[in-house]
Amino acid sequence: MFLRDLMHLVCAGLLGCALSGAAISADLREIRDRGELRHLGIRYANFVTGSGDGFDVELIQGFAKHIGVTYRFIQTDFYTAIRDLLGQNVVRRGDEVALEGAFPVRGDLIASGFTVLPWREKVLLYSAPTFPSQVLLVARAESPRKPIKGSHDINADIAETKAQIGRSSLLVMERTCLDPANYGLKGKGIDLRAYTKSTNLNERVPALLNGDAEFTLLDVPDAILDLQKWTGKIKIIGPVSDEQHLAVAFPKSSPELRRAFNEYLGQIRSDGRYDALVQKYYPGIRRYFPSFFSSGG
C-alpha cells in the first residue's frame, strides 16, 4: 500500500513539474486575484499600432479597468498568438484541428483585429463582435485587371473577383486571417507566393508594390488605411469573402472572463465610448458596414 501511494505521489509530482513550465489559462477570478490582465496583441493596422495605442489597446485597457485590474500588453504575432494564449500549438489537418505540445501561457486574451473563423472557434471562445471586416483582392494601380462593378449578390461578386486572379500570382500569408485556404483559393491553379520575410501583415502592400506578386489580400480596415497611405498606387479589385466579424478571443476555460467582457462591450456601446474609439481609429468605416454599426454588431 505504501509503495502504491508513494508512486501516486511521485507521478503527481512529475505531472506538476511538467505543467509548471506551461502556465494554466486563467478565468476571471484568477485574473482578479492576480490583479493584472495580460493582453496578447499583434501589430496590425490601427488595432495595435505599435506606438502604445490602437483600437484594441484602448478597448482592453478599458476592460481591465472595468474588472478592477491593471493592464499589461504582451506583443505576439499571428503565428504564435493562439499558442501564447492556450499553451499549445494549433495544428490543422483539413477540417480537423488539434492542440499539440506544451508551452508557457503568456496572455489571457487576444485582441488585435482577430477574425472569427470556423477553425479557430473549435479551440477558442469568442466575444460578441467588436468590429466588422471583409477580405478584398488588391492589385497595383497599373494592373490591367479592372475592379468589378459589384452587384446586390455578394456570392456573384466573390466569384467574379476570384476569376480575375486566373493563374496570376497572389501574395499570401498562411495561418493568418488572410490564409488563402480560408477563401477557397488553394488548388485553383493560382500562383500562391508565401510572404515569409516577416510576420507583420502590414508589409504586404510594400511587397506588392515591390513586384513580389500581382495581387494580395487585405481586409477592409487595413485597406482603408493603405489606400490613404499609398494613394494612387493600389486599387481594390473586389471581395473574396462575405462580411466577417472581428472579436476578442479567450481560452475555452475562461467563460466568465468572456461574459465580463461582453457585459463591458455592451456598456461602452450604450454610453458612446465604443463609437468614440471607432471614430478615433477608423473614421469613415461606418459607410462600409452601416448595418453592423446601426444594429450594435
Report the location of each language-model feature.
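A ligand-binding cleft/hinge motif common to bilobed small-molecule-binding domains
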Residues: 97-121, 181-185, 206-242
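Acidic, polar ligand-binding/catalytic clefts
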Residues: 57, 61, 65, 70-159, ...
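Bacterial N-terminal signal peptides
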Residues: 8-20
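Periplasmic-binding protein-like
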Residues: 42-43, 130-138, 144-145, 203, ...
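Short glycine-rich His-centered loop
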Residues: 27-55
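Boundary at the C-terminal end of the N-terminal hydrophobic targeting segment
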Residues: 22-25
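A local structural motif
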Residues: 64-77, 164-167, 185-199, 212
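Extended ligand-binding regions for polar small-molecule ligands
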Residues: 57-66, 139-169, 245-285
